[in-house]
């Protein structure tokens, strides 16, 4: 029940921030504000007979030409090998991270490549409480001309369950989403 309420709240927040971001760009100045919202779905390679699936909302602020600060919430579902799902198979994490655009777009059609590092930790009560560490490369198009652009992320994630006495989950991840 709590996870569905958090997911609904995150979805409403994403829609609200999307409208703010869409209206914040001025035609005359053609400058975009350095605040963006990303919503994405992700999956990690199976580890210890568990497949993690994620729903992620990321609010990011570009504070310098190539550097960005991220505040993120992730709702994860841990699918066991037998495919059984229960309410206790999920966890909601809150955290943050930093990004560095190492390959800025020279051409509007290419987009930017950003190296990101995140740390999140579980909130609320869950059997899958964890601390998550993510490092990856994310691609996104330019938002100066388009209000909604695709994002793709590839990287490595480690989920530390040491507080619960469970085995850690680690592996490659892929995320697909939209940037507002």
Question: Model-found features: residue ranges?
Answer:
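A charged, solvent-exposed segment within the mature domains of Sec-exported extracytoplasmic proteins
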Residues: 127-179
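Cleavable N-terminal export/targeting peptides
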Residues: 1-32
């Amino acid at each position: 029940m709590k996870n569905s309420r958090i997911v609904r709240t995150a979805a409403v927040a994403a829609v609200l921030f999307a409208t703010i971001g869409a209206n914040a760009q001025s035609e005359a100045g053609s400058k975009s504000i350095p605040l963006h919202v990303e919503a994405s779905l992700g999956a990690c390679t199976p580890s210890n007979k568990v497949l993690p699936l994620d729903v992620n909302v990321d609010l990011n602020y570009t504070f310098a030409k190539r550097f960005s600060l991220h505040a993120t919430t992730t709702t994860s579902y841990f699918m066991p090998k037998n495919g059984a799902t229960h309410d206790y198979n999920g966890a909601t994490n809150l955290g943050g991270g930093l990004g560095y655009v190492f390959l800025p777009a020279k051409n509007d059609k290419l987009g930017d490549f950003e190296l990101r590092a995140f740390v999140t930790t579980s909130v609320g009560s869950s059997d899958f409480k964890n601390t998550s560490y993510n490092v990856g490369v994310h691609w996104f198009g330019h938002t100066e001309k388009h209000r909604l652009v695709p994002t793709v992320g590839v990287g490595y994630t480690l989920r530390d369950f040491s507080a619960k006495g469970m085995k850690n989950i680690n592996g490659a991840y892929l995320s697909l989403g939209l940037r507002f």
